[in-house]
Every structure is written in structure tokens, then in C-alpha cells.
Regions:
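Acidic-glycine-rich active-site phosphate/pyrophosphate-binding loop
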Residues: 60-75, 140, 155-167, 306
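A non-catalytic alpha/beta surface segment that caps or lines the substrate-entry region
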Residues: 2-5, 9-52
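Acidic/histidine-rich catalytic neighborhood of metal-dependent amide-processing enzymes
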Residues: 78, 83, 87-159, 201, ...
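Metal-dependent amide/peptide-bond hydrolase catalytic core
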Residues: 3, 8, 184-377
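Short beta-strand segments
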Residues: 57-58, 115-117, 143-147, 167-169, ...
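Catalytic-core environment of secreted peptidases
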Residues: 45-87
Length: 377
């Protein structure tokens, strides 16, 4: 029920405050020392007797815009609703961990910090975890990002990503009387097609996504502006740089091709006459996530493996783009794991969650927390 309540509090990008307040109340009820930092992260601490902090973090935000119906529906054992798995499952796991620490009255050597952070999704650019890592500084021993439900993976490698907003502007005009003037939407379409045709290597694994396109004012107006938001990802920073250059070149080629094909409205049947107007392109970075990798012989990974062995859980090593990217890029041991249960349809309106075997995930987090923090006898 707590997961449903959290999921039904809207938390779009840059709009996580109400959900943060709800999580803070849960932490306070569990007896944690609670604060909210300037970035909007809510932090609850179970204080240790010695220096060092073990940070468990789950992101508060979702990919869904303000106004999305976030009501959770039931279908048998399934809970269905935007964000119910990503990341209400992670937040509910933190809430359960807070209660377990309180009810067990356990004392640890290192401080166990639980944080609901902002800005993990979309254009948040991991601003929440950046602030947490900066705030704890050298005290930070380990970071465990709790992202989604599944416990059959351990994310030990952070995929690098760069995100851009490409904007093309032109003179605009009437679809009939100004026909032939360069069209920013057409120029953008040309560029997208050109970039989509480039070679994307299987190794290092890389990807791209044109996620949001905007432009135009009416069906009978030549638009004066068009923009697209693009996500580039790769396991390798040099390949990511190659993709960025290829994107710039393709979009500019689309602009130049559109200019060459345009003509003056007064040119009659002379379609070879170039338009004297010009177009401009702006290439704006809107996000950058660094890569990082946890060594296979890391004590953090060994601890999780030991707990998994005790619980009879088998988990594969994975790579992804999560809150763990930031500490990994700085050499701080970090992983991303699930909070328990099963889920699917992430980032869609039909996202679902099944609490089957959820207890296994919660036990896993609790035992990992105690093993890393150390019992204070």
C-alpha cells in the first residue's frame, strides 16, 4: 500500500517536492535523522559510531510529464500505473529498509544513509546524486542505487551518455504564398534520416534515440522553428564523441540540403533558384553522464554476492545508466540493484509491478546494509 501511495504522488522532472515530503515523513516515523538538502533530496540517516557512510539511494522522479494520470490499478497480483516499478518500487524498498533498521534496533559502525534523490530521469542530469556525493565527500564508503524491482541483476558498469537539443530556425511563412522557402521541420527530418543511417557498433555497445520533436504553429504555416531532443549512449567515451560529431554533421547536412532544395516564391517553375533566406542551427547540450565501472574484485560486489549466496539468489552483472554512474566515475564503489518483486513496461503508461518474492529483495538490502556498515557490538 505504501508503494501505491508513493506512486500516486506525481513526480515529473523538476517536480519531485511533494513525493519527497511523503518519503521524509516515512523516514521520520522510522526514527531516522531526516533532512532535505538544497537540491531537493530527502535524506534519512541511521547514525553509526565511527566515520564512513553507506548510502542507499532511490530516485524520486519519473519520466511522465505533469498532468499524467498516475492512478494505480489492480489486475490480479499486478499493480499497473506509470512509475509503479520505476521507481516507486525502489522508494518502497527504502521505506521498508528504514523500518527494518528501526525495529531491529541494530547499531552499526558506519552511518547508513537512505536518500530519495531528484533528477535521475530525463534532463535531470543526475543532479540529485551529484549533490549527495558532493555533500558526503570523503565520508562516502559505498553507494547502492535501488532502481526498479528486479533482484536478478547487479549493475556494476555505468554507461556514458550525452543529450542534446538541436534547434533549427528559418524565416517561416504561409504554406501557399511562401511555398519554397526553407522549412526547419523538413531540414530536421533530413538530418535525422542521415544520422539514422550511420553505423552503430555492436562493440562497444552504443545507442541513440530521437525522443522529443517540437515545431510549427499550424498545418498551413511554414514553421519558423523546429527542435529535437536526442539521447546518445555508449560503453566507450571515444565512441560517444564520434556519435556526437556524426550527429552535428548529419543535422547540418540536413540544413544545407534543405537550403539547396528551396526556391524563391517568385521563381515560377524555376525550382533551381535558391532562396536568399538562411537557416540557423543551435546544438545545445542538455545532459552528460560519465561512465564508470566497479572492479570485479571489489569488496562491495563480494558482499552482495555473499548475501545472494546466503539467500539462494542468482544475479548477473549488468551495465546501465543509473545514479551509480556518478560515484563510479569518481572511483567510489557503487552498484545499482532492484528492491524486490517483478516489473515491466518501464516508461510506459502500462507499467506494472508484481510483489511476488518481494521479501527476498528487502532481506537482501537489509543484510547488505548491515554487512557494509558493520555491527557495533
Amino acid at each position: 500500500e505504501q508503494q501505491i501511495r508513493l506512486s500516486e504522488i506525481p513526480a515529473p522532472e523538476f517536480g519531485e517536492a511533494e513525493r519527497a515530503r511523503a518519503l521524509a515523513a516515512i523516514f521520520e516515523a522510522a526514527g531516522l535523522k531526516v533532512r532535505t538538502d538544497e537540491t531537493g533530496n530527502v535524506i534519512g540517516e541511521s547514525l553509526g559510531s565511527q566515520p564512513g557512510v553507506i548510502l542507499f539511494v532511490a530516485h524520486l522522479d519519473t519520466v511522465f510529464p505533469a498532468g499524467t494520470d498516475v492512478t494505480v490499478k489492480r489486475d490480479g497480483n499486478h499493480l499497473i500505473g506509470p512509475g509503479i516499478s520505476d521507481n516507486a518500487a525502489g522508494l518502497a524498498a527504502l521505506a521498508s529498509l528504514a523500518r527494518a533498521l528501526s525495529e531491529s534496533r541494530v547499531k552499526t559502525k558506519k552511518t547508513i544513509a537512505l536518500a530519495g534523490d531528484v533528477g535521475e530521469e530525463g534532463e535531470g542530469n543526475l543532479r540529485g546524486i551529484r549533490a549527495l556525493v558532493d555533500g558526503y565527500g570523503s565520508r562516502l564508503a559505498n553507494v547502492i542505487a535501488v532502481d526498479g524491482p528486479s533482484i536478478d541483476y547487479i549493475t556494476t558498469q555505468g554507461i556514458a551518455s550525452r543529450r542534446f537539443e538541436v534547434t533549427i530556425t528559418g524565416p517561416g511563412g504561409h504554406s501557399w504564398s511562401d511555398f519554397g522557402e526553407p522549412n526547419p521541420i523538413t531540414a530536421m527530418a533530413r538530418g535525422i534520416v542521415k544520422f539514422s543511417a550511420i553505423r552503430i557498433p555492436a562493440n562497444p555497445r552504443s545507442s541513440f534515440n530521437f525522443g522529443v520533436i517540437e515545431g510549427g504553429t499550424s498545418v498551413n504555416s511554414i514553421p519558423a522553428r523546429a527542435s529535437v531532443k536526442v539521447d546518445l549512449r555508449s560503453e566507450d567515451e571515444s565512441e560517444l564523441a564520434r556519435l556526437e560529431k556524426a550527429l552535428r554533421d548529419a543535422m547540418m547536412a540536413g540544413v544545407n540540403e534543405e537550403l539547396r532544395s528551396s526556391r524563391s516564391p517568385d521563381a515560377g517553375d524555376d525550382y533551381t533558384q535558391l532562396n536568399q533566406f538562411h537557416m540557423q542551427m543551435e546544438f545545445l547540450p542538455i545532459g552528460s553522464r560519465p561512465a564508470g565501472k566497479l572492479p570485479n574484485d571489489s569488496p562491495l560486489l563480494a558482499t552482495i554476492r555473499s548475501v545472494d549466496s546466503y539467500l539462494g539468489n542468482r544475479a548477473r552483472l549488468e551495465r546501465s545508466s543509473t545514479d551509480a554512474n556518478i560515484p563510479l566515475s569518481l572511483g567510489i564503489p557503487a552498484v545499482a540493484v532492484g528492491g524486490g518483486g517483478r516489473g515491466g513496461g518501464s516508461h510506459t503508461l502500462e507499467e506494472w509491478y508484481d510483489p511476488a518474492a518481494r521479501d527476498q529483495g528487502l532481506k537482501r538490502l537489509y543484510l547488505v546494509a548491515l554487512a557494509l556498515a558493520g555491527l557495533d557490538r
